[in-house]
């Protein structure tokens, strides 16, 4: 088992039914899927300001799952609390979040990097005082709207739900993201990067 493998998976999103299944919550979606598959019960933990659970996964060892419930812009507070409590290093985490600059059907693993325009990542980098931690970006595509107000178009896009026509591809993306995550946990982030960063999924062609 690789020495650089993550042990804490952090999915970013906004809490509450209002934001469930929105593009901005694709990180939450993957954590929920992993929790279900691994039999992990996620419970609200006040000291962590998030939904938290842990388990021993066969072949992967002890894994912790976290969904910050601070709202996206304060995600770093929740993650910092977990790192301090368990004395984990930034290199032991994998942050999973949405990325508009990648099309739906692409994912990108990196060992470090900037936050770009993602406010959840800005909060995490600020609270960790470091950009050196693994992350998994899941593409949600750019807004299709040609609105003159780019900010409004962006907000509407990330807080909007995936279209019916995107649901099949979304499921494939989550399948692939789960594979990539489990590879990172088992063999290290670099191995997962080499195996999955070049993969590209496309929506199935409509039946004639």
From Swiss-Prot:
List of residues binding tRNA: 19, 71, 73, 119
UniProt-listed GO biological process terms: protein quality control for misfolded or incompletely synthesized proteins; rescue of stalled ribosome
Annotated PROSITE patterns: PEPT_TRNA_HYDROL_1, PEPT_TRNA_HYDROL_2
Cellular component, GO annotation: cytoplasm
Sites annotated Discriminates between blocked and unblocked aminoacyl-tRNA: 14
List of catalytic residues: 24 (proton acceptor)
Site (Stabilizes the basic form of H active site to accept a proton) residue list: 98
A GO molecular function held by the record: peptidyl-tRNA hydrolase activity
Assembly and interaction partners: Monomer.
Task of the protein: Hydrolyzes ribosome-free peptidyl-tRNAs (with 1 or more amino acids incorporated), which drop off the ribosome during protein synthesis, or as a result of ribosome stalling.
Name recorded for this polypeptide: Peptidyl-tRNA hydrolase
Organism: Synechococcus elongatus (strain ATCC 33912 / PCC 7942 / FACHB-805)
Gene: pth
């Amino acid at each position: 088992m690789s020495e650089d493998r993550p042990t804490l998976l952090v999915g970013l999103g906004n809490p509450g039914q209002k934001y469930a299944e929105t593009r901005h919550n694709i990180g939450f979606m993957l954590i929920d899927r992993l929790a279900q598959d691994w039999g992990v019960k996620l419970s609200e933990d006040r000291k962590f300001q998030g939904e938290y659970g842990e388990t021993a996964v066969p072949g992967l060892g002890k894994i912790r799952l976290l969904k910050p419930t601070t709202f996206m812009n304060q995600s770093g507070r929740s993650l910092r609390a977990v790192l301090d409590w368990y004395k984990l290093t930034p290199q032991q985490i994998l942050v999973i979040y949405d990325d508009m600059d990648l099309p739906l059907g692409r994912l990108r693993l990196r060992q470090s990097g900037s936050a770009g325009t993602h406010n959840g990542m800005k909060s995490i980098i600020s609270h960790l005082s470091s950009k050196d931690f693994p992350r998994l970006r899941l593409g949600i595509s750019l807004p299709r709207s040609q609105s003159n107000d780019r900010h409004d178009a962006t907000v509407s896009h990330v807080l909007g739900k995936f279209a019916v026509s995107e649901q099949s591809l979304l499921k494939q993306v989550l399948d692939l993201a789960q594979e990539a995550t489990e590879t990172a946990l088992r063999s290290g982030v670099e191995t997962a990067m080499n195996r999955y960063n070049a993969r590209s999924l496309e929506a199935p062609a409509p039946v004639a």
